Amino acid sequence: MDKYTKIKHLFEQNRDEENAIKMSKYMRDLFKFYGLATPIRKSFYKDLLKEEKVSKVVDWDFLDKCYEDDYREFQYLVMDYLVTMQKYLTYDDVSKIFKYIKSKQWWDTIDGLDRIVGNIAFKDERINDLMLKWSKDEDFWVRRIAIDHQLCRKEKN
């Protein structure tokens, strides 16, 4: 069983319908949820993240499959994965992350992705020109990333 299927199976087996309804309502019914509390959700892929970190290779096919899933917990998994692997993310990965920024947009994912982009900015100054371009984008969420990615810089200075 591949890692996506294994995690999906765990999410489905542990679904909390009552909590899923509340979570969806909180997000204005924009997304479906399994209703998993954060500690429970993270426990299902904690070991996977450890293994991935040891491999030092970002599995973009796995991440794409997760991000495309209809349930919001999978987008959260992608963000947790990217945070775990941020040491290995480079400027060249920003185009892949941009696909996530443009898809299933809402505060929860955008505010997580801006920190990931912000951490890449510490390693590569080319991000500065890209963020200037994004700051003029017609998409509100892309502009938000361009502005908010700087929060990491404030914390480091």
Language-model features: where?
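Alpha-helical scaffold domains
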Residues: 1-157
